[in-house]
Amino acid sequence: MKALLDLFKQVQQPEVFDAIKIGLASPDKIRSWSFGEVKKPETINYRTFKPERDGLFCAKIFGPIKDYECLCGKYKRLKHRGVICEKCGVEVTLAKVRRERMGHIELASPVAHIWFLKSLPSRLGMVLDMTLRDIERVLYFEAYVVIDPGMTPLKARQIMTEEDYYNKVEEYGDEFRAEMGAEGVRELLRAINIDEQVEMLRTELKNTGSEAKIKKYAKRLKVLEAFQRSGIKPDWMVLEVLPVLPPELRPLVPLDGGRFATSDLNDLYRRVINRNNRLKRLLELKAPEIIVRNEKRMLQEAVDSLLDNGRRGKAMTGANKRPLKSLADMIKGKGGRFRQNLLGKRVDYSGRSVIVVGPTLKLHQCGLPKLMALELFKPFIFNKLEVMGVATTIKAAKKEVENQTPVVWDILEEVIREHPVMLNRAPTLHRLGIQAFEPVLIEGKAIQLHPLVCAAFNADFDGDQMAVHVPLSLEAQMEARTLMLASNNILFPANGDPSIVPSQDIVLGLYYATREAVNAKGEGLTFTGVSEALRAYENKEVELASRVNVRITEMVHNEDKSDGAPAFVPKISLYATTVGRAILSEILPPGLPFSVLNKPLKKKEISRLINTAFRKCGLRETVIFADQLMQSGFRLATRAGISICVDDMLVPPQKETIVGDAAKKVKEYDRQYMSGLVTSQERYNNVVDIWSATSEAVGKAMMEQLSTEPVTDRDGNETRQESFNSIYMMADSGARGSAVQIRQLAGMRGLMAKPDGSIIETPITANFREGLNVLQYFISTHGARKGLADTALKTANSGYLTRRLVDVTQDLVVVEDDCGTSNGVAMKALVEGGEVVEALRDRILGRVTVADVVNPESQETLYETGTLLDEDAVEEIERLGIDEVRVRTPLTCETRYGLCAACYGRDLGRGSSVNVGEAVGVIAAQSIGEPGTQLTMRTFHIGGAASRAAVASSVEAKSNGTVRFTATMRYVTNAKGEQIVISRSGEAMITDDHGRERERHKVPYGATLLQLDGAQIKAGTQLATWDPMTRPIITEYGGTVKFENVEEGVTVAKQIDDVTGLSTLVVIDVKRRGSQASKTVRPQVKLLDANGEEVKIPNTEHSVQIGFQVGALITVKDGQQVQVGEVLARIPTESQKTRDITGGLPRVAELFEARSPKDAGILAEVTGTTSFGKDTKGKQRLVITDLEGNQHEFLIAKEKQVLVHDGQVVNKGEMIVDGPADPHDILRLQGVEALSRYIVDEVQDVYRLQGVKINDKHIEVIVRQMLRRVQITDNGDTRFIPGEQVERSDMLDENDRMIAEDKRPATYENVLLGITKASLSTDSFISAASFQETTRVLTEAAIMGKRDDLRGLKENVIVGRLIPAGTGLAFHKARKSKELSDRERFDQIAAEESFEFGTPETPAAEQQHSGE
């Protein structure tokens, strides 16, 4: 019987669908869903526990409580399936229909849906063109609204108070109609003729000129067009029928003691039903208007609370005074349906336990506790037991397993063989946080983890726990084995470096074994082979570090490539090496030369070694090699027995004198301050400077002493060798600790910061070895506590950044091999402050070329367009001195939905070209988000110590080569023959013999050039010098000075220098000027030529006028002759405010959110000539006249620093007012490539500061997603509205259609959206709703009748399908093509049938819809 029942409960085939549509339900639709009206607020009878009839749990409406059994018990059993009991009215069927059958409530008075009323911008307001305030007054019965003005002078939609209404009624009688409440609003909505309105708005839009109106009309048009397109009637925003959720979804559970636990929804529904019934009764009794009105208002409020409690007014509360959880609360937020149940679920067949180290495991194995394995693989074991005939039934099998008989353990071994399990450590910040391993059964209760995968999991063994998951199906096991097995994931997807790098003991052991010592035992011996050296070592004839000569056999690549020839051939050579290195040479994989081991192995070296092995010998050899490295490291570290003691921390003897000298200097500054020679701030800055220098000096002295030790060599001479001090070795090898930490142990702790980030000027002169006194200890608690508080904040912030990044990129998948674009970006080495920060080879590695790479010497093509550049290629490019390579980038990829493999290039986690189906968006988001917790949270104040060091006064070349100036460099020659720079953004480059850029330096305005373009120079040559303390104002033309508006006491003041007695004129601040007139003028200089005429700017009618900024010291006199390049005035740089620099995480978030910085710099909108117009109050007016003679004005605050002067020619996009750049301006004026360069470089700066490596392409992928919307400038013949923002792919599809129909396509400009905004504005409403602002997203989608094509990953996870990435992409493609071929077959059969019988064919349209 049970089996029979199960037969009927067979799982229905899941519906196959391509898209999900959302809309507003009409009242008839709601009634059609319903299985009956809920008339009573009763739930269940507390004595019988049976649901009340017509109540919220009524069995007649919602279905039976027990399977195939009616309520009164007349019909039981399967044979009555589908009968409706005549006594209790219940249909005999499965009880689970109570999860899907809905009811409804007929409302006595219509009610407005709060989402469309209150969710901003109010949709009701938009449609009716009324303010939200007015609509609310009407809905909540505070005012009347005119519905039909008739022949009266009243206007439709006019609001009037009750008094007004009665007056008008007296005046006009029943000429006009006005209503209150939702009825009135519904009438208005019904009266709207959408087509008419849309036409009207479109014409208005074309004819109006005011910005505000255009904005308003466009918004309203968008909403109305949405209604028009979706076929949803606006009056459906007012409910007449309220659907009731199926009872199983709002359960009522009896607790012991006769109480019930219930879902809040039941409470909310009860209120609605109570008020509705009361209203019905009042209407039947023809109660006074005021009572009815009050009841209607209460009904409206009850429905509001049910839909979205707390959205308007005070939230309804239950018996325990907490707000009730409404329908809206059920779906939104972290605990809502989307994020709690759809995007993250609890998983069957999983377990978790503490992890311990498993040094004996292979890389692809993990130790699984026996009991855990038994529990996880239970069904498999039951099956095996039945198949083998040990147990006859599942029940018997269960018993066997519970008794843990020997046969069960044998079977477990068998089941587990070749069946990978997945291990996961939370937080899973990148894809290496879940990896598959083959389980090895172990005793105990802890999971054993291989030491080399700890780096990827970020795991340690101080009590970390990990979860185990079992892939059940064969496909899942296959994917786990091929894609997720730990030995297949040995590179970080973020940067392509190996993730299986040894750390701690392993590094220490390898380092110790490969160090060399002077005059160790047996130095200078020669051995015939490694085995002989090993024998000598084991007989204590030599030490590990002894320098010896050994014959070593290496396996090298065979030159003979013929068939049957071995791939590797042995090559024997004698090496001068150490015993330890020779012994290690045994584990070298074939194909790697011994030279890679013939040096002290530090952590970085080992990482490089594994990387080389992977590139040269392939995955399998590398994994084996890494495992052997680990085993050797552990063994050697154990044998070495390195330990530390207090005496290892050597305090340098010079420390006392260094600290003493510093204290003297500080005293001197204190004395100067007391006598008033320096200000308090200067004294503080200097003191901090002194102490940080002292700290450095002590640290340096300590490291010098620690890092070397004296020894006697074989010939009896005293020499020094690298120290074998344990602490030094740990730090030097990279096993543990760093120079900074050693400095605190044995040098001095140095300066500490207060919680607000400012530095305490009293340093801690002691170190941990000497011990801190009470005051010093107290000072250091500050920093420690701030560190802990910061860490907690950082984790949350970093997690939120990752979530936003994943959300914006989740639908970006590689969908084709090549989009065929010819666009790309030019990649150069990244040079900052004259140093190469990132070499060209690192930036183009793994990219596809978009133009031929040409050998500069022979001009022949090295690499064709479309070549994927690998390690050999980039090395060749570097060797030839090519300084710029054009490569493909995700930014310019022309694939519509997704990316192509060529634009992305190499998959960094696999080391080969990226596969179609790779979810590159999510990988990019994880790569940027994962190191987020390592970034700081602080904002740097530049001022004091930091800026002191930053003042440079000259720039010198770091390498030999030729000087080259950029196109923006402009200079004049003054009377002394010196070249004075007059450009603001000029840069000097040094290029080598091949013309490749080696370094690049900014040369500021007013600098004196010492070398000119094309000069051949040696390293160390000065290129330019300048005065760091002042900024000059320089004339580009000669002539006689004529002052304008330079009046003493009005615009300038005379200052007399105390020391020299010379007087200078200083331009005074606007605020300090006396008369009103003098506030608007600007002191400036004009130049006169020999005839007394004003000197004009060449080729223009403008006279030369040079304005003086506030605070400028004027150094020339009226009437003085000046030559070209002479200084007219100087501005002391001290007066510049120190500005905060946002660093760390907040900076990254700021960049990705595309926020405009406050006090942003201003860029020139056009190319043209600058001049200053009439100043307004507190602002100066800068005018740029373009080449056609059109003028563009900028108003600039007086305190801002203008970087241009009168008559200067500026290029479009050039900075004209100093300040941080605004990414939106860069995009508008300089284009996508400049924007991407800006964002990539800025983000990389933050990460580089923390020593984190992230590949550029990940950031480019995010920028692509930030640019995925465009703004329509001219709509042509398309359906778009000018100024509307639309998805780029939509716009391109629409334009393609227009071009195909010979109509005018739309023109557009790029828009940069921050990641939050970009996620919310995605086409998929499911994805947007599950991210943030759920209510707003769903409201908008419902009105527009949006359809979600389920293109992204999130949408598919939510509806429970395979994601369209990886193996899922192929699955979906196959499914779609199968559907197509099925449909074609169906059409063909239909055609044949109709041909035979002469029946008309079904119209194609119907067939199209049947698929949706």
Swiss-Prot record:
The keyword Cell membrane does not apply. GO terms for molecular function: DNA binding; DNA-directed RNA polymerase activity; magnesium ion binding; zinc ion binding. Residues 1391-1412 are annotated as: Disordered. Its EC number is 2.7.7.6. GO terms for cellular component: DNA-directed RNA polymerase complex. Mg(2+) binds at D460, D462, D464. The RNAP catalytic core consists of 2 alpha, 1 beta, 1 beta' and 1 omega subunit. When a sigma factor is associated with the core the holoenzyme is formed, which can initiate transcription. This is DNA-directed RNA polymerase subunit beta'. It comes from Paraburkholderia xenovorans (strain LB400).
